[in-house]
Each structure stands twice: as structure tokens, then as C-alpha cells.
Curated annotation (Swiss-Prot):
GO biological process: translation
Family of this protein: Belongs to the universal ribosomal protein uS7 family.
Record localization: Mitochondrion
Role: One of the primary rRNA binding proteins, it binds directly to 18S rRNA where it nucleates assembly of the head domain of the small subunit.
Gene designation per UniProt: RPS7
Protein name: Small ribosomal subunit protein uS7m
Keywords: Mitochondrion, Ribonucleoprotein, Ribosomal protein, RNA-binding, rRNA-binding
Protein species of origin: Beta vulgaris
SUPFAM superfamilies: Ribosomal protein S7
Cross-referenced InterPro entries: Ribosomal_uS7, Ribosomal_uS7_bac/org-type, Ribosomal_uS7_dom, Ribosomal_uS7_dom_sf, RPS7_plant
Primary location recorded for the protein, binned into one broad class: mitochondrion
This protein's GO CC annotations: mitochondrial small ribosomal subunit
Length: 148
């Protein structure tokens, strides 16, 4: 991570930290770097590709449940910038884990496929984003219940 700026370092650090289970940072870092090596062989600039993939998955709006007069409404709202990146990375990792369970292949390959799909604006994580935006759009008539 020598020639990277702070935003790029933060993105890689978040990817490793969200991926980590039971404190096994070295193992996770090896998986992430193997994935990046695979991306470098196919696409070229890995960091730009990863940043673009996260940008394509970032949700702009969210839906929160609010109780008004005994009825629960799905109220749309705007997602903070830090939260957008966090959700995008989390959704990419979730999608990679889902692929691993359904296809029984290595996690590096699944993460590689999901990052490429996110870069090309398709895949499981992109579908999750589209579903969230559709739900927010469908419930925009309840936006006047938003008081936060």
C-alpha cells in the first residue's frame, strides 16, 4: 500500500476489516490481495476498478420504519456519504459469500467476480441497491413523516 492516497488506503482497510472474522486479519488480507492480483491480470488498474465498483453500488437513499398513529410506514431518507461506502463494501462481501455457498468455489474467485459485476453495474449487490431505491421511490409519498 505504498503509493496510495488516504482515501484508497481507507477503502482497502474497510474491505479487510469488514471481511475479517475472529481477528484473522493476515488471512483476510491475503485473500483480498489475491483477489486484487487476479483483477490486475484481467483489468489493469485495480484500485480505480475497486473505487468505481464501490461507487456503482453505493445507495443514495434508504428506508426507515416509522410508527405514526399505530401504523408503521417505510419512510425514505438520504444516506450519509460514509454510510454509503460502508453499505457498498458490505453488500459486495455479502454477495461474494452468497456466491461461495451456492457455487462452492474459492472466496477469492467469488470476490473477484462480484467486484467485476459491481464495476459493470450488475450482480447481486447491484440488485440489492436497485431494490432499495425502488422501495424508497415507491414510498416517497410518506416522506413528510421524516423528522430527523
Amino acid at each position: 500500500m505504498g503509493g496510495l492516497d488516504s482515501e484508497q488506503k481507507q477503502l482497502i482497510k474497510k474491505l479487510v476489516n469488514f471481511h475479517m472474522k475472529e481477528g484473522k486479519r493476515t488471512k483476510v488480507r491475503a485473500i483480498v490481495y489475491q483477489t486484487f492480483h487476479r483483477l490486475a491480470r484481467t483489468e489493469g488498474d485495480v484500485i480505480k476498478l475497486m473505487i468505481d465498483a464501490v461507487e456503482n453500488i453505493k445507495p443514495i437513499c434508504k428506508v426507515e420504519k416509522v410508527r405514526v398513529a399505530g401504523t408503521i410506514y417505510d419512510v425514505p431518507g438520504i444516506v450519509a456519504r460514509d454510510r454509503q461506502q460502508t453499505l457498498a463494501i458490505r453488500w459486495i462481501l455479502e454477495a461474494a459469500f452468497k456466491r461461495r455457498i451456492s457455487y462452492r468455489i474459492s472466496l477469492e474467485k467469488c470476490l473477484f467476480d462480484e467486484i467485476l459485476d459491481a464495476y459493470r453495474k450488475r450482480g447481486i449487490s447491484r440488485k440489492k441497491r436497485e431494490n432499495l431505491h425502488g422501495l424508497a421511490s415507491a414510498n416517497r409519498s410518506f416522506a413528510h413523516f421524516r423528522w430527523w
